[in-house]
UniProtKB/Swiss-Prot annotation:
Means of activity regulation: Inhibited by FK506.
UniProt family annotation: Belongs to the FKBP-type PPIase family.
Entry-linked InterPro entries: PPIase_dom_sf (IPR046357), PPIase_FKBP_dom (IPR001179)
Any one Pfam family match given in the protein's UniProt record, by short name: FKBP_C
Gene: fbp
Keyword Isomerase attributed: yes
Function: PPIases accelerate the folding of proteins.
Species, as recorded: Neisseria meningitidis serogroup B (strain ATCC BAA-335 / MC58)
The PPIase FKBP-type domain, residue ranges: 20-108
Protein name: FK506-binding protein
Molecular-function annotations in GO: peptidyl-prolyl cis-trans isomerase activity
Keywords attached to this entry: Isomerase, Rotamase
Length: 109
């Protein structure tokens, strides 16, 4: 079992996402078997969160850190930094590794 794996797909050149900042993101999430379980792109509705305060799974709080506006990353998130032994909403099974492609749209001052 490894930790969080961050792969930069596209370098961003805008403001940097740091703990405590509000950010707006697009994301798509898959299980390891390729099953897509959620996508803000499919809804055409980005998500705004405050980074590093526990609003989202730990893999996101850490995975967006240091990213710059316009950047895209692939995050491979181990279960303990995702939804753990409980899974989520009948869609994410217990102990699931999650794979997200994320795009940082905006960092707010």
């Amino acid at each position: 079992m490894g930790g969080l794996i961050i792969e930069d797909l596209q370098e961003g050149f805008g403001k940097e996402a740091v703990k405590g900042k509000e950010i707006t993101v697009h994301y798509t999430g898959w299980l390891e078997n390729g099953t897509k379980f959620d996508s803000s792109l499919d809804r055409r509705q980005p998500l705004t969160i405050t980074l590093g305060v526990g609003q989202v799974i730990k893999g996101w709080d850490e995975g967006f850190g240091g990213m710059k506006e316009g950047g895209k990353r692939k995050l491979t998130i181990p279960s303990e930094m995702g939804y753990g032994a409980h899974g989520a909403g009948g869609v994410i099974p217990p102990h699931a590794t999650l794979i997200f492609e994320v795009e940082l749209l905006k960092v707010y001052e």
